[in-house]
Amino acid sequence: MKPFPRAEISRYALQSNLAQLRLIAPNSKIMAVVKANGYGHGLLNVAECVGLLNYVESVCKYHGGADGFGLARLEEALQLREGGVKGKLLLLEGFFRQSDLPTLVSHNIDTVVHHESQLQMLETIALDKPVTVWIKIDTGMHRIGFSLEQFNSIYQRLLACPQVAKPIHLMTHFACADEPDNPLTQTQMNAFEQQVSGLEGDRTLANSAGTLFWPTSQADWVRPGIALYGVSPVVGDRGVNHRLIPAMELVSNLIAVREHKAGDSVGYGASWTAKKDTRLGVVAIGYGDGYPRNAPEGTPVWINGRRVPIVGRVSMDMLTVDLGADAQDNVGDSVQLWGKALAVEEVAEHIGTIAYELVTKLTPRVVVELLD
């Protein structure tokens, strides 16, 4: 028997999703965003499946592998280099310390520059060769990036800095692209174009939502994150609506099946009481594995071809489901918490969160297994 709980990662789904994103953005290069351990799918798993690993070069060419990878931390980028990735890597938050800069140079890692402190570090260091920079413009997200008023002076300082490779690349990030009717995205696109018109360098604006819903934002590069994993970035939408395939199936097993009498409660706090005689199943997964404790009663799981509801509170190692009075389920039967049969987007909606949070919060107790 395979270990459980486990996250089964589909190589085919990842490669199919990349191919579909190429059809959606045919004139753009793809920077696959693999931060947070490949959105919980395993950093090197994703890298192997969608391109750039030296030992799967022929496979990546056949499938049209990603043109680069976007990451949040230098440690993630170094893990990819150590794993054999040779292509473009970009630190989406940039570097945090001046001492990081020689490492960026020696490992050929691009960096975002979004703050005055980073520029000062570049201006006061001597490097063996210049570092490739993407200047981030704050067009409306108001999180990181140079304001529209700052941009010209910052850009000129970067041009004058010998530690910065030329041309300088240009980027912004959307605040509301996952709301297809929100006019802010078009406002951000207009502001970005006004700032960068006539400048050299590659441009990137589109995250997953931009790529799927705002085709005029696709530019030189798109940066799909959650879409690469077969999940829609838009609440109420599903990845399958865009011909994307869920890449993760979170599965476990039934470890107990119990007769349960009407009027009996179950679990901590006795928060659920059976209205009629039924059979309960106990599933070996809980908040210690990253399944949310706040999943309400009625959140579905998938067992033997049907949905059954969670009842009672999710505990650290287990959760309980109402199998029904006539259930024929047995100890050892497989349980899918989300995946192809039960969209992670739907589970997230039941819990009151987003799919991003579910897939990235799995703990090390969950075995991540790459399948063909």
From Swiss-Prot:
- Output the CDD domains linked to this UniProt entry: PLPDE_III_AR_proteobact
GO terms under biological process: D-alanine biosynthetic process
- List the Pfam families: Ala_racemase_C, Ala_racemase_N
Q: Name one GO cellular component term.
A: cytosol
Q: Which prosthetic group or cofactor does it need? A: pyridoxal 5'-phosphate
**Which enzyme class?**
isomerase
Record's catalysed reaction(s): L-alanine = D-alanine
User: Pathway involvement?
Assistant: Amino-acid biosynthesis; D-alanine biosynthesis; D-alanine from L-alanine: step 1/1
Q: Provide this UniProt record's keywords sorted from A to Z.
A: Isomerase, Pyridoxal phosphate
N6-(pyridoxal phosphate)lysine found at:
K35
| Record-listed substrate binding positions | R143, M316
Q: Name one GO molecular function term.
A: alanine racemase activity
Q: Which residues form the signal peptide?
A: none
Residue positions of the active site: K35, Y268
**In this UniProt entry, which cysteines form S-S bonds?**
none
- The answer to whether keyword NADP applies is no
Functional description taken from the UniProt entry: Catalyzes the interconversion of L-alanine and D-alanine. May also act on other amino acids.
Q: What does the sequence similarity comment in the record state about its family?
A: Belongs to the alanine racemase family.
Recorded protein name is Alanine racemase
Q: Which organism is it from?
A: Shewanella frigidimarina (strain NCIMB 400)
**Which lineage?**
Bacteria, Pseudomonadati, Pseudomonadota, Gammaproteobacteria, Alteromonadales
Q: Which gene encodes it?
A: alr
